[in-house]
Amino acid sequence: MYRIGEALIGSGNEVAHIDLIIGDKEGNAGAAFANGLTNLSLGHTPLLSVVRPNLMTKPATLIVPKVTVSCLEDADKVFGPAQTAVARAVADSVEEGIIPEEKAEDLVVIVSVFIHPEAEDYRKIYQYNYGATKLALRRAMEGYPSVRKVLSEKDRGSHPIMGFRAVRLWNPPYLQVALDLDSMEEMERIINTLPDRERILLEAGTPLVKKFGVGVVRRIRELRRDAFIIADLKTLDVGRIEVKMAADETADAVAISGLGTVESIEKAIHEAQKQGIYSILDMMNVENFVDKLRGLKYKPDIVLLHRNVDLETLRAERGEELGEMSEWGNIREIKEILGPRGLVAVAGGITPSKMQEALDSGADIIVVGRYIIGSRDVRRAAEDFLEHMPQDPDTMRLPLDEDEAI
């Protein structure tokens, strides 16, 4: 039996990132410990963690450098402040009861340590690695994080080294701005004018894609690096190729026409799943779209419904119950088919005064085109809709509050 812990503390070149395993000396952890100590790797030579020369810590701890140690200067950082920090963190964890003292002889710890080659401040190297090791040990012994914690955080944060946010639609509602334009200059002007809000999704409209190609998505990305960008391809055929083209240009989602055959739609949705992007099934002019959706083996992530003024009359003529009906159809029925993660977008002449009705009907995404892009005051027009939505997720969340609750 062994436990796993991880922690990142600090900033700059002295930042500490600790990965560790703690487990029984007689089990898999002990075997890994012995293997690491006896099978040396050039530039990554493991060393026992000592509080001071001739006094190794308990539980016995093996330090493995993550970054290649290429010179004596690098070795000094590992054998000096990093080794001391890890040893004292382990010993203090025993003293504080994080590691049971009675188990200290029966356990071993393997600590993978990151030391940047350009780190210079030995005090910071010590401080950050001490804190990170101790935190990683506590997390390992307490089983942090829980699966529920991981699921609740996976779409919220961003990795500092990655340099950008991979946006996921985890907290609707959202405002999708349809850039149905034929001018690159006008597109750039509108994007630069829109509020920088997480709740705004940018759609490369069909006219833009037809005139400038799917590469227009990358231009939008240059203007709004962390935006959620939709390529409105209205794919009818060869869906796999078109979806891959959109994904290659960094689109987060691609719109597929619901008028296509079941086979074509499923291939496009499957390709979107392979590429790791959202699939949007556009039900414009699709009759019996509920039946079509039910017949799909692979369900889309999002269904786009368009305002149909004749729908209510048609259902009434059939003698069907209208209680759950909206101008876009029975949104809640669509959601039941899609499952708990499915989203519904609605489009068609929506104004700020009409928006609340759409949200109350169950819509997750409000698609707006002319009201915003045709406005003399694009920013104000977008804010008219955003006023009906909650603040962006985590607006009031303090830094570091994403970690353990205490």
From Swiss-Prot:
Pfam families per UniProt = Fae, OMPdecase
The pathway is: Carbohydrate biosynthesis; D-ribose 5-phosphate biosynthesis
The record's section on PANTHER family has: 3-KETO-L-GULONATE-6-PHOSPHATE DECARBOXYLASE SGBH-RELATED (PTHR35039:SF3)
InterPro entries, per the entry: Aldolase_TIM, Fae/Hps, HCHO-activating_enzyme, HCHO-activating_enzyme_sf, HPS/KGPDC, OMPdeCOase_dom, Ribosomal_Su5_D2-typ_SF, RibuloseP-bd_barrel
Enzyme group, top EC level? lyase
Query: EC number(s) on record?
Result: 4.2.1.147, 4.1.2.43
Protein name as catalogued: Bifunctional enzyme Fae/Hps
What this chain does, per the record?
Catalyzes the condensation of formaldehyde with tetrahydromethanopterin (H(4)MPT) to 5,10-methylenetetrahydromethanopterin.
- Please give a single GO biological process term from the UniProt record: carbohydrate biosynthetic process
Q: What organism does this protein naturally occur in?
A: Methanothermobacter thermautotrophicus (strain ATCC 29096 / DSM 1053 / JCM 10044 / NBRC 100330 / Delta H) (Methanobacterium thermoautotrophicum)
The residues the record assigns to binding substrate are D19, L48, K66, T68, Q83
